[in-house]
Amino acid sequence: MYQEAVMTDTKNPIQVSERIFHTIECLAQNGAMGLQELSTALDLNKSTVHRILNSLICMDYVRQDPETAKYSLSFKICGLSNQILSQNSMIDIARPFIKELSANSGETVHLVQLDGINATYIDKVEASQNSVRMISMVGKSIPLYCSGVGKAILADMPDAKIESIWKQSFIQQLTEHTVTRFVDFMNLIEETRRSGYALDNEENEIGVRCIAVSLKGYNGKSTYAISISAPKDRMSDARILLLREMILKTKHQIESNIY
């Protein structure tokens, strides 16, 4: 039934796949949407979108509210992400150490994994004593060029690879502090290499600073990173120096348990 529903649109399987995943991504980003809203957002006619939605409903990835007639993703999508995360042994290895780091620092700690030109949050520990919560979510991606974790990972790569990732990225001024010139960005990378840690000075989110370090995976390459994030009024330069010792210790603990 699924194949019949989508293949009536086009004989190009790549185009079919793109439309299906664009629909899923659109619903993930916007929440519940009506047929006309989706048609406009995806730039597809309503009959095409309707067939895609029916296919996704048949597979239990999308549900339609009987009262509003709007479409939204089902929890089956969450099940897929949970299955992926459950297969990642780095989460199990790092978890006790990032919990300890969060408890000792009193701040939110993230664990991310390199994902193309982005870093994806694969674990997060929020300190219970602080009421301010970060907008980050496990499963969400963040660009490498404007994040502490991204710079930490990139600093361990050759310059040519960094330039390639930069050119593939959609560089935009997310905040007034976002670095958008490659030469300036490479200066930050050099500073990260010298210090052994990276900073995010409100480059991705106004009012938030973070300190990050890379983590080597089983292949010996820096494909992970951890960070401590907090409102800037709790992240003075003096405190960052104190947090540096904590996060570098955690980096050593995690990597020592991998090899």
Positions of predicted regions on the chain:
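Extended hydrophobic
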Residues: 177-251
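Amphipathic alpha-helical effector-binding/dimerization core
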Residues: 72-168
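Short, conserved catalytic or interaction motifs in soluble domains
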Residues: 29, 127, 217
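N-terminal helix-turn-helix
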Residues: 1-87, 91-92, 99, 256-257
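Cysteine/selenocysteine-centered motifs that mediate thiol-based redox chemistry or coordinate metal-sulfur cofactors
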Residues: 161-165, 170-172, 251-259
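A structural signal for short hydrophobic beta-strand segments in well-ordered beta-sheet cores
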Residues: 62-64, 111-112, 215
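Short, structured helix-loop boundary elements
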Residues: 13-17, 70, 74, 87, ...
